[in-house]
From Swiss-Prot:
Keyword set includes Disulfide bond: no
Family matches, as InterPro entries: DNA-dir_RNA_pol_RpoA/D/Rpb3, RBP11-like, RNApol_insert_sf
EC numbers on record: 2.7.7.6
Subunit architecture: In plastids the minimal PEP RNA polymerase catalytic core is composed of four subunits: alpha, beta, beta', and beta''. When a (nuclear-encoded) sigma factor is associated with the core the holoenzyme is formed, which can initiate transcription.
Gene giving rise to this polypeptide: rpoA
Enzyme class name: transferase
Molecular function via GO: DNA-directed RNA polymerase activity; protein dimerization activity
Record protein name field: DNA-directed RNA polymerase subunit alpha
């Protein structure tokens, strides 16, 4: 017998979020003895892992193909934008990974050479990664002569800056009604199942 029956009541895509309304029907009395709803909410908001840009390294190549590392306050004449705003845009990129990776760290690469504009689509991603961010334009350049390489370290972790879950509401009556909002890097149903795995209840779940 399944401890939990999950019924999807509503799901939709909002402007920059995914929304899900579900009912969790609890079939066994022992689940009533747990602070079940609050536990799930706490796990959803604090324990869900996700990938995010953690470190950015920028390398500038000169005409002799010698490269050196520059920082966000370096003045680069060929770049219209300042590098600080460029790095902020890179840090805010939202990624979706379609397969579970064994590692908690991977890399993406952006090559800037002979372009006047650089877009999100120019980023070379690891296999099975997709960029979800909407703002496509990253940086504008004054010259085709510049040669930059930008290395993005993607780190998988949990906490406010990483968590795909933006908001969780619940009402507990005989059953539990959950409203879950995510930033699209994971679906609400995916994170709900992950939360049940953490407390080892996914094997008792019927959808």
């Amino acid at each position: 017998m399944k401890l939990l029956n999950l019924k999807i009541m509503n799901k939709k895509r909002l402007k920059d979020q995914l929304y899900l309304l579900v009912i969790l029907e609890k079939n066994l009395i022992k689940l009533e003895l747990l602070s079940f709803s609050n536990l799930i909410r706490r796990i959803l908001l604090k324990e869900i892992y996700n990938f995010k840009v953690s470190t950015i390294s920028i390398f500038l190549f000169n005409s002799n193909k010698f490269c050196y590392k520059i920082h966000e306050f370096t003045k680069v004449e060929e770049v219209k934008n300042n590098l600080v705003s460029f790095l902020i845009l890179l840090k805010e990129i939202k990624f979706r990974s379609y397969y579970k990776l064994k590692t908690k760290r991977t890399f993406a690469l952006l090559k800037i050479k002979q372009f006047t504009q650089v877009f999100l689509t120019d980023i070379i991603l690891p296999n099975n990664f997709k960029i979800l961010s909407i703002d496509n334009n990253l940086i504008k350049l004054n010259s085709l002569d510049i040669n930059l390489k930008v290395l993005l370290e993607l780190h998988k972790s949990k906490g406010y800056n990483f968590n795909p879950v933006k908001k969780v509401n619940y009402i507990e009556e005989n059953n539990v009604y959950f409203e879950i909002y995510t930033n699209q890097t994971s679906t609400p149903l995916e994170v709900l199942v992950k939360s049940l795995k953490i407390i080892k209840l996914e094997t008792y779940l019927a959808i």
